[in-house]
Amino acid sequence: MKIRKVTAADLKLGMLIPWNVYGENGALLVRKGHMIASANQIDYLVERGSFEDHSGQHEAPREPDSALRKLNAASLELHALLQAVSQRAAPPDLRRRLDDVALLVTDAVAVNADVAVATILHNQRAAPYAVRHCIDTAVVAQLLAKAKQLSPEETASLTLAALTMNVAMLEQHQRMQDSRLELSAADRAVVQAHPEAGVQLLRLAGIADQAWLDCILHHHENEDGSGYPLRKSGAQIPPLARLLALADRYCARVAERAWRKTMTPHAALRDLLLESNVTVDGNLAALLIRELGIYPIGTYVRLINGEIGVVSRRGLQSTTPHVESVIGPRGAPLEVFLQRDTRAELHGIREVLSHAQLATLQAPPLRMEQVWGRSAAV
């Protein structure tokens, strides 16, 4: 065993520190198992920290990665970065730090895509809406990028655009989320201007990736030319912006909002398909449904036998996903969740439950780890 200084290579966002870290005077700075949640923490530990290096000795089994933990770490870091950019006080290493956030999202999807998708519905209190919505959109954008077989460079530009698309309306976005009032004329003007204003802020912060910036500029354009800010249509809209627009609109519709009724994932996908070639590209809307399924992961459903459960993973067909029943047919919460294959007659899906229906059940809050295991650990 030897004492070794912490280096930047030892740490990355979202990781659980595998050792106790001590300061120069031997005081404990952070305990083993602490999660790295920001680049500032990394800088602090590199500057001050040392640890007992047990390399070569028998190591304890490594804790499995958690997709949920990675996405929460991404939200924490992204919040600070977006605030800095919006205040024209971006750090000089902004691009690197945003790349690190994008990598956390990529890693989360790679660890468990089902958990990453489920967080869109089941992790809505983890960060302010204006930040969390960007993380959610980046998750869906990653799935679409993989389905479209985009290059690594295109996928990176799309993901970074999703993370920063609303940087010019952070304050208004959060206020709209919490308010039951209609938008004021001033707020409406900010919303209409935010694609162009966001591009300007990012340019001022040193971002020069044109594909990324074009994606943000066009993510509110519509297929029929009725969008904003440039009223472009069809092939005039960059392909990456079309993907971002679709991911953005799906995630916005399923989010809890004070000012409008929350849509079920099933209904949100149906609406996007009905809007084919008016607001969104019809082929891409169909692709989104293929990727998420008719019953996206995390959807609450009622089964034929009366049980209520959560869609936990895809089935052999989009109409027959696997479900974890969490409430019994008589309305009592189940102490042990029951795995149900909805191909079975009694376990078929009767209906998708709305947010209002769920509110009447008075069931205990669902911990994602109960359904998806350690890859959904906090």
Question: What residue ranges belong to the model's regions?
Answer:
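Short helix/loop capping segments that flank catalytic or ligand/cofactor-binding pockets
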Residues: A39, E153, V254-A255
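Alpha-helical scaffolding flanking metal-ion-dependent phosphate/phosphodiester catalytic sites
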Residues: G33, T137, L158-E171, A186-Q200, ...
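Juxtamembrane/interface motifs at transmembrane-helix termini
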Residues: F51, M176-S179, A211, S233-A235
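A short alpha-helix capping/helix-coil boundary motif
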Residues: W19-Y22, I120-L121, Q177-S179, A247, ...
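Residue-level signal for pocket-adjacent positions within structured domains
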Residues: V6, L16, E24-N25, R31, ...
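Acidic/His-rich, divalent-metal-binding segments that scaffold phosphate/diphosphate chemistry
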Residues: H58-Q192, E196-V199, R203-D209
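Terminal helices and disordered tails flanking the catalytic cores of nucleotide-processing hydrolases
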Residues: M1-A102, A258, T262-V378
